[in-house]
Amino acid sequence: MPGPECKWSTTETGAPCGTDDSSGRLAPVFVYGTLKTGQPNHRVLLDGAHGRAAFRGRAHTLEPYPLVIAGEHNIPRLLNLPGRGHRVFGEVYEVDERMLRFLDEFESCPDMYQRTRLHVALEGVRGPLECFVYTTATYPPEWVHLPYLDDYDSQGKHGLRYNPRENR
């Protein structure tokens, strides 16, 4: 059974599960892990049954964050510790409310990830862009000491193979 339904966040900090917004607007979402192009879960962004997701470009966080691979399934996690780690590379998608709700459920928000906001530099665009992102705020203390990545690849030289959901 899925956790509580997350809705559009309206606070400056992007507190998870804010108020609903049915305005039909598109929300920018920064993805840094298995949802990126060429990664194991990218297909869910392409599936129109979940809503609309339009690729806007490559980007990187303006602040450094610790991006680690953690847990028994080698899941990439962006720890919500701005100022530590590296500027993280990823992609920005503009998503409709239906896709955002799907992503909240897919990312087990708010139990496993929390939908927050951060600023990114989008390639070819001047000025920062505020995006939603799925970060991890609650985790075992040893995760802070794992190696920090700046650009996740499930087949990367780190040797930690992601275990897809369908194999768990």
Swiss-Prot record:
Coiled coil: none annotated. Residues 1-20 are annotated as: Disordered. Belongs to the gamma-glutamylcyclotransferase family. Contributes to degradation of proteins cross-linked by transglutaminases by degrading the cross-link between a lysine and a glutamic acid residue. Catalyzes the formation of 5-oxo-L-proline from L-gamma-glutamyl-L-epsilon-lysine. Inactive with L-gamma-glutamyl-alpha-amino acid substrates such as L-gamma-glutamyl-L-alpha-cysteine and L-gamma-glutamyl-L-alpha-alanine. GO terms for biological process: modified amino acid catabolic process. It catalyses: epsilon-(gamma-L-glutamyl)-L-lysine = 5-oxo-L-proline + L-lysine. GO terms for cellular component: cytosol. It is an enzyme of class 4 (lyase). Keywords: Lyase. The gene is GGACT. InterPro entries: AIG2-like_dom, GGACT, GGCT-like, GGCT-like_sf. Its EC number is 4.3.2.8. This is Gamma-glutamylaminecyclotransferase. GO terms for molecular function: gamma-glutamylaminecyclotransferase activity. It comes from Bos taurus. The active site is at E107 (proton acceptor). Monomer. Substrate binds at Y32, G33, T34, L35. The keyword Protein transport does not apply.
